[in-house]
């Protein structure tokens, strides 16, 4: 890892952010992290903690405080408003799109070595089959689903515009479904796993995605920082999988019975009831029309580019899922006595 750089990680307590931050800290790097919650910082970071700046991605004044010293800086921008539905459109746009623009704006007059924008495979235009080199990935917001997908696409547009108009040394890092230890935020798939273990998930659906281990990105982070080319896009993923496959690995480890699998049309029939339940309880729904659409998408993403340029290798999904469950137990997010 290049220790001559000062690393700035926005969203350093988030799922992706904390895993990458811990990797940098383990390598002895100088890391400055943007966070909003002191309580979460204490929960996420134990022995090693980055220099924390408490602030909001929507405030340029807060973001200016991240640039301590003269650099050179490597910015790893992970902040986004994550939602499996359309979400609060204003907050989605303000955090994910304008927040990215704010980070770009405050970086333009700094000594930036690399600006890594952590994006998502959800930003890929509907129906687009990526080339091996991702040269045909052109963010097209109106060809993505409204909500998180579209917001990430707009954010990608802002980054590429900054590359074109201001020579920002930025690259797009698209991530498929993130799994593995480190999810202190109870993201959607983690909640599905917890509900299954706790007996609150009555059935699975006949669909899948592409889930990979975020630790495998951390392992090649040094090569990403040094070798990612300005203006280019990279995708980290594994192979397409099924929800049943993930849950069966969970079940094998926790001695839980396999769930029945519902056809997709039944899942769609249940949407109004989930929406009503969400409104009554204030809890997020188990799934939405947007998340069901993702389960039907082609997720056979090309990995040749990251394998060749960064030495990336996706570990077996079963190993990732088991380690994910172990993490939940160790952090008391599930009760091990549920299955031991």
Ranges and model annotations:
Residues 6-27:
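N-terminal Rossmann NAD(P)H-binding glycine-rich loop of SDR-like oxidoreductase domains
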Residues 46, 51-98, 106:
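NAD(P)H-binding glycine-rich loop region in Rossmannoid oxidoreductase-like domains
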Residues 98-147:
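Conserved Rossmann-fold NAD(P)-dependent oxidoreductase catalytic core, especially the SDR/UDP-sugar
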Residues 145-146, 176-185, 202-215:
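Glycine-rich "substrate-gating" loop/helix at the edge of Rossmann-like oxidoreductase active sites
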Residues 157-181:
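Conserved beta-loop-beta element that borders a ligand/cofactor-binding pocket
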Residues 166-168, 180-191, 224-234, 256-257:
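Glycine/proline-rich active-site loop of Rossmann-fold NAD(P)-dependent oxidoreductases
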Residues 188, 205-225, 232:
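Substrate-positioning beta->alpha
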Residues 220-286, 303, 308, 316-340:
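Mid/C-terminal beta-alpha module of Rossmann-like enzyme folds, strongest
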